[in-house]
């Protein structure tokens, strides 16, 4: 908090996790895997089994970063289900913490989980599991700003160790970050947050996306195409496999 910026990146498999772990403080197995890997239009279709299988793979690639797993839609609707599913995820995937979307509406659930020693990361602003229709930024109008600040302070009081702020207007994100002692991790929420998170596939240029907050830091799709093109060409020309690559 208020020191070195926190780096958070997503991973859905061992290979990606191994590379992400070299740079990330937090590796997030996000329910964004629904759109990235399965072409779902919404994260609501992601199941607990989806999250757990990918998380098990990710765990094998992590050595140093904190591993956080998104709890998918409808897996924490009440205290009983939330605790049962959270324990299952942590026990079977060996993750370090789970992430839930929401503030005041799920305060009793968060309180119950933390009381039972479940480490929780919060998520405020745009809540993908609750969105119907177009995604819109949050915190522009006074009432939203007030509620987001209130929810942030509430989550801090409940004991979450960090809060993701998604698509939160700049001045609101700055105010929240300055008003609480736990770290804020921004995604489309300005440079003023204590850290930043992006979907790794997006920032590496693997996905075609026009989301405003996504900056492409590499063009991995181009590199992949070049490699596959060379592979095909060498097979056609009978250059591969040469003696070096044959038994």
Where are each of the predicted segments found?
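Alpha/beta enzyme core
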Residues: 1-218, 222-247
């Amino acid at each position: 908090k208020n020191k070195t910026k926190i780096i958070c990146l997503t991973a859905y498999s061992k290979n990606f996790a191994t590379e992400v772990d070299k740079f990330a403080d937090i590796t997030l197995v996000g329910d964004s895997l629904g759109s990235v890997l399965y072409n779902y239009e919404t994260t609501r279709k992601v199941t607990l089994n989806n999250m757990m299988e990918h998380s098990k793979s990710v765990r094998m690639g992590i050595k140093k970063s904190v591993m956080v797993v998104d709890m998918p839609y409808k897996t924490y609707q009440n205290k009983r289900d939330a605790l049962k599913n959270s324990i299952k995820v942590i026990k079977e995937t060996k993750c370090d913490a789970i992430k839930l979307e929401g503030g005041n509406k799920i305060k009793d659930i968060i309180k119950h989980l933390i009381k039972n020693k479940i480490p929780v990361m919060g998520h405020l602003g745009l809540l993908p599991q609750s969105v119907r229709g177009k995604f819109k930024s949050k915190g522009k109008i006074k009432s939203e700003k007030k509620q987001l600040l209130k929810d942030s302070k509430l989550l801090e009081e409940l004991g979450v160790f960090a809060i993701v702020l998604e698509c939160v207007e700049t001045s609101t994100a700055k105010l929240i970050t300055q008003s609480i002692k736990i770290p804020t991790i921004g995604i489309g929420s300005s440079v003023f947050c204590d850290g930043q998170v992006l979907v790794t596939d997006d920032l590496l240029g693997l996905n075609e996306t026009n989301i405003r907050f996504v900056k492409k830091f590499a063009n991995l799709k181009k590199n992949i195409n070049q490699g596959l093109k060379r592979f095909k060409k060498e097979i056609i020309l009978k250059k591969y496999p040469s003696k070096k690559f044959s038994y």
